[in-house]
């Protein structure tokens, strides 16, 4: 009885934590559902539905990462865990007519779970912020000298510097007329 009670408490604690960490995406889903109900254009309906799938995929994969984190012995996740999450998220972006690809350094290296979550959260933040203006995204995560680095190539006709100003840790450079390079180091 006591073990069952403790297990139920731990499950509730984890679910509450996940809900708190993803409150912004849950709110976004609610807004998108409201938009979906109001839209009369089939094209707009499909676009909004695609965005709902993208956010829903993130919620599902992030929950999986957190649960994997808490079932591991030492609060670790692997690059493979991140790779699987990015694969599913990139696949869902097709519904928004965005070409998406990723590269996560090979190896089943175990890393601090918070670092892996930051990498995935950064991807989602970029997607949410830029899904209306980008045509393609290539998201790369590599580990150099024990430091995780994120580098992103984005094709967009919009000035991304303005859209991403609220995240000063993301360095934004314009490479060509419609090509942008975004980079950051995942700080512990």
Please identify what each model-predicted range represents.
Residues 8, 41, 163-188:
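Flexible, glycine-/charge-rich segments associated with ATP-binding catalytic modules
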Residues 25, 29-32, 36, 110-141:
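Conserved ATP-binding N-box helix of the HATPase_c
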Residues 57-60, 67, 91-100, 168-173, ...:
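Structural alpha-beta junctions
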Residues 1-93, 120:
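Signal-transmission coiled-coils
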Residues 79-115:
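Helix-loop-beta hinge of the Bergerat
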Residues 151-157, 186:
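Acidic ATP/Mg2+-coordinating residue in the GHKL
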Residues 138-153:
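Short beta-strand/loop element within the Bergerat-fold HATPase_c
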Residues 122-128, 160-171:
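Short, non-transmembrane amphipathic alpha-helical segments
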């Amino acid at each position: 009885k006591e073990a069952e009670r403790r297990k139920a408490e731990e499950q509730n604690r984890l679910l509450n934590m996940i809900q708190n960490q993803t409150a912004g995406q849950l709110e976004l889903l609610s807004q998108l559902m409201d938009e979906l109900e109001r839209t009369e254009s089939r094209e707009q309906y499909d676009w909004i539905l695609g965005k709902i799938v993208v956010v829903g995929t993130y919620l599902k994969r992030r929950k999986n990462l957190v649960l994997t984190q808490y079932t591991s012995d030492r609060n670790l996740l692997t690059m493979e865990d991140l790779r699987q999450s990015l694969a599913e998220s990139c696949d869902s972006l097709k519904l928004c007519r965005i070409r998406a690809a990723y590269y996560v350094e090979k190896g089943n290296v175990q890393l601090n779970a918070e670092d892996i979550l930051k990498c995935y959260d950064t991807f989602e933040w970029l997607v949410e912020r830029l899904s209306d203006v980008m045509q393609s995204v290539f998201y790369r995560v590599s580990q150099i000298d024990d430091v995780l680095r994120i580098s992103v190539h984005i094709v967009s006709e919009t000035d991304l510097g303005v859209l991403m100003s609220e995240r000063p840790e993301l360095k934004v450079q314009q490479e060509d007329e419609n090509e942008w390079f975004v980079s950051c180091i995942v700080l512990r």
